[in-house]
A protein has these predicted regions:
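Catalytic nucleophile-loop/oxyanion-hole region of alpha/beta-hydrolase
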Residues: 63-89, 94
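Conserved alpha/beta-hydrolase "acid-adjacent" motif
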Residues: 201-207
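Active-site nucleophile loop of the alpha/beta-hydrolase fold
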Residues: 120-129
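Short beta-strand/loop motif that positions the catalytic acidic residue
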Residues: 188, 194-196, 200
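Catalytic histidine neighborhood in serine/cysteine hydrolases
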Residues: 215-231
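Gly/Ala-rich beta-loop-alpha elbow adjacent to hydrolase catalytic centers
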Residues: 97-101, 105
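Short, surface-exposed "cap/lid" segments of acyl-processing enzymes
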Residues: 1, 17-57, 63
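Catalytic active-site module of serine/aspartate enzymes centered on a nucleophile-bearing elbow/loop
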Residues: 227-257
């Protein structure tokens, strides 16, 4: 477990910024591993001249026990703080996120409106179809954690740095984030790009389908990834995501110039 790693902040030459939000339960959020999904994604965007922040969220990059002492409002507060910091120096801010990071990105878009120029989501989650999900409110009171799915990556030799267990109190709080996102989803009207893996063992495809069916975005696109699992930003389709994200930002900026 990697501890006490600062957030990643990269200064580009442009006055546009990108906020990259991470998945849950992952030490990748600490940007400790040069091959981590957050860092590589962020550096790719910085190479295109954008100022990038990839914040380390409370409870991330430490231990699952510490994660279990946090709630979704703690994670969101850090995302919001990073957004405010970017907005001080950047005329336009794009928000990108993987898995739970996608949930947080959607919530930020709902609350910040036209303060966000566009969204890029990778295998975003707004609900779960697990049969045991209805037991979570009760299980969290008696069991601290369940075994988790770690390294859902098709490409060999990759390590996302995930926690070996899912902290149940934090997972229960995540369901409240999903509820908040779903309640206000029609407020999302920014340009939207979603990358979805066809073979994802963590987030069901119904999540992306629901998001696209309910957002108010007139500019919304889904890109299907055929050679990656859940952590697609570290998988065989990573370059598709990196290049597609940069192209998306460039297109939106050109259309608004």
């Amino acid at each position: 477990i990697v501890k006490d790693i600062p957030q990643l902040s990269l200064k580009g030459g442009a006055v546009q910024g990108t906020l990259v939000t991470p998945s849950a339960w992952l030490t990748e959020t600490a940007a400790a591993d040069p091959e981590s999904s957050t860092e590589v994604w962020a550096k790719h965007l910085a190479d295109h001249g954008y100022t990038v922040r990839a914040p380390r969220l409370p409870g991330h990059g430490t231990t699952w026990q510490e994660m279990n002492s946090t709630v979704w409002q703690d994670w969101y507060a850090e995302i919001e703080r990073s957004f405010r910091e970017l907005s001080k120096t950047c005329d336009k801010v794009f928000v990108m996120g993987l898995s739970m990071g996608g949930s947080l990105a959607l919530r930020l878009a709902e609350e910040k409106g036209n303060g966000i120029a566009g969204l890029v989501l990778v295998n975003p989650a707004v609900h779960s179809e697990r049969q045991d999900r209805h037991l979570l409110p009760f299980l969290r009171l008696v069991i601290p954690a369940f075994p988790g799915i770690v390294n859902d990556i098709k490409k060999t030799g990759q390590d996302e740095g995930g926690y070996p267990k899912i902290p149940l109190k934090a997972a229960y709080s995540l369901t409240h984030l999903w509820a908040a996102v779903k309640a206000d989803i029609t407020k999302v009207d920014q340009p939207l790009l979603i990358f979805r893996s066809t073979d994802d063992h963590v987030v069901e495809p119904s999540n992306t389908a629901w998001i696209l069916a309910n957002v108010a975005s007139k500019d919304a696109e889904e890109v299907v990834l055929h050679d990656s699992y859940h952590v697609a930003t570290m998988d065989n389709d990573a370059e598709t995501i990196y290049d597609g994200s940069a192209d998306f930002v460039e297109r939106i900026l050109a259309e608004r110039s």
